[in-house]
């Protein structure tokens, strides 16, 4: 069973915590992680890319010159894809790129992502995190105490506007709730900081 240190907001180790083997100690499946990230990025795509085919470009209905006798290559329209201002071959059209990933695959990917953070010593547990009023400076000091100076994903057990607003102005810092964490965000951040109560909720929800 994985065991990690628990820190306070001053960066001092206050205790240790055993994590669930079923969530934070699984075998990391890189292929499943790849599929989950690919799925998330595909679902984010707007799918609004569009270009005109030769049939859709305005003009070009008249043959630019006669077929024979000019010495030029034959041409039937000035909107051929070979011409400047012509249509696009196999022009992209708006479409929905999203697709559904099986629930079991999503669960396994999330567990693999969390396990990878534990294995790489990039997961950090806080005994508690609470702010009465939004203050970016306080959040900066907390992260500094925890040596979290790069991209940080901060996960809390309950929604706290003061914490969210305090972290929102810090470059590279993202806040999330237990039910909103995802594989891409976990892997895309260097540090995964989670409160003790949030760990308990993760183990309860994803067990």
Curated annotation (Swiss-Prot):
This is Large ribosomal subunit protein uL4. It comes from Alkaliphilus metalliredigens (strain QYMF). Part of the 50S ribosomal subunit. The gene is rplD. GO terms for molecular function: rRNA binding; structural constituent of ribosome. The keyword rRNA-binding applies. Keywords: Ribonucleoprotein, Ribosomal protein, RNA-binding, rRNA-binding. Belongs to the universal ribosomal protein uL4 family. Residues 60-71 have a biased composition (Basic residues). It comes from the Bacteria. Signal peptide: none annotated. GO terms for biological process: translation. Residues 43-52 have a biased composition (Polar residues). One of the primary rRNA binding proteins, this protein initially binds near the 5'-end of the 23S rRNA. It is important during the early stages of 50S assembly. It makes multiple contacts with different domains of the 23S rRNA in the assembled 50S subunit and ribosome. Transmembrane segments: none annotated. One of its GO terms (cellular component) is ribosome. HAMAP family: Ribosomal_uL4_B (MF_01328_B). Residues 43-72 are annotated as: Disordered. Pfam families: Ribosomal_L4 (PF00573).
């Amino acid at each position: 069973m994985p065991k990690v240190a628990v820190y306070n907001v001053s960066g001092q180790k206050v205790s240790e915590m055993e994590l669930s083997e079923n969530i934070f100690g699984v075998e990391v499946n890189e292929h499943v992680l790849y599929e989950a990230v690919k799925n998330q990025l595909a679902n984010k795509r707007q799918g609004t890319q569009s270009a005109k085919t030769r049939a859709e470009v305005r003009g070009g209905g008249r043959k630019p010159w006669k077929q024979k006798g000019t010495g030029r290559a034959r041409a039937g329209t000035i909107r051929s894809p070979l011409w400047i201002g012509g249509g696009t071959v196999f022009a992209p059209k708006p479409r929905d790129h999203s697709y559904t990933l099986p629930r079991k695959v999503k669960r396994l990917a999330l567990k693999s992502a969390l396990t990878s953070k534990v294995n790489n010593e990039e997961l950090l547990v806080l005994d508690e995190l609470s702010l009465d009023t939004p203050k970016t400076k306080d959040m900066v000091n907390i992260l500094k105490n925890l040596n979290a100076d790069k991209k940080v994903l901060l996960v809390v057990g309950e929604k706290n506007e003061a914490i969210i607003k305090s972290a929102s102005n810090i470059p590279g810092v993202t806040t999330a709730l237990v039910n909103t964490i995802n594989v891409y965000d976990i892997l895309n951040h260097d540090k995964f900081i989670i409160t003790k109560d949030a760990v308990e909720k993760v183990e309860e929800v994803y067990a």
